[in-house]
Amino acid sequence: MAKNRFNQHWLHDHINDPYVKMAQREGYRARAAYKLKEIDEQDKLIRPGQVIVDLGAAPGSWSQYARNKLAQGKQRDAQREGGIDGTIIALDLLPMEPIADVHFLQGDFREDDVLHQLEGVLEGRPVDLVISDMAPNLSGVASADAARIEHICDLALEFAQNHLKPEGALLVKCFHGSGYSQIVEKFKQQFKVVAPRKPKASRDKSSETFILGRQLKHPR
């Protein structure tokens, strides 16, 4: 009975969520698009001509937002061919419905075949921005969840170290709680500028937060 009440309460909140309504109206696949939008508007992350990689992209709302931003850049420069001024590569273990002008690679980005496909799209270019809305399945056991969250962030940090240009940026989802300070410290070891971000679109009750790192300390 308690579980049913919880589900009904969640459904009521979801249906009445202004960001859910806005996402439906504006064609985004998830309300998460507005988290990236708010951070981007604050930090000017996405700019015309960039190479952007979206880790854990499904269902695709972050890639949709990035695509729309780069399409605006295309409109300002009618000389360019193609639909956007830049390149977006989305990766996920799960399948994802196609998004115009977005290269989708399904698989584990640590595996050689996926990395080979990625390098084929990059054509030797370094990445300007890595974005990650990845989150593990949480168990409710604090110590286990902290380890899973840290592992996800470690994967994004390693990917960024291997592919970002020196002045590039990494934005990842994280959660406040056990292990959070260790993740921030890892960002500080890797980036010159590190800042937490809690967009308004992130639900108040959620411990979800985002960490932004800019300018690699030890670029490869």
UniProtKB/Swiss-Prot annotation:
Q: Which organism is it from?
A: Burkholderia vietnamiensis (strain G4 / LMG 22486) (Burkholderia cepacia (strain R1808))
Free-text function comment from the UniProt entry = Specifically methylates the uridine in position 2552 of 23S rRNA at the 2'-O position of the ribose in the fully assembled 50S ribosomal subunit.
GO molecular function terms listed in the Swiss-Prot or TrEMBL record: rRNA (uridine-2'-O-)-methyltransferase activity
Record InterPro entries = RNA_methyltr_RlmE, RNA_MeTrfase_FtsJ_dom, rRNA-MeTfrase_E, SAM-dependent_MTases_sf
- The answer, when asked if Acetylation is one of the entry's keywords, is no
Where does this one sit in the cell? Cytoplasm
Output the Gene Ontology cellular-component terms: cytoplasm
EC number assigned by the record: 2.1.1.166
User: Could you identify this protein by its name?
Assistant: Ribosomal RNA large subunit methyltransferase E
| Database matches in Pfam families | FtsJ
Keywords in UniProt for this one? Cytoplasm, Methyltransferase, rRNA processing, S-adenosyl-L-methionine, Transferase
User: What is catalyzed by this enzyme?
Assistant: uridine(2552) in 23S rRNA + S-adenosyl-L-methionine = 2'-O-methyluridine(2552) in 23S rRNA + S-adenosyl-L-homocysteine + H(+)
Report the superkingdom from the record: Bacteria
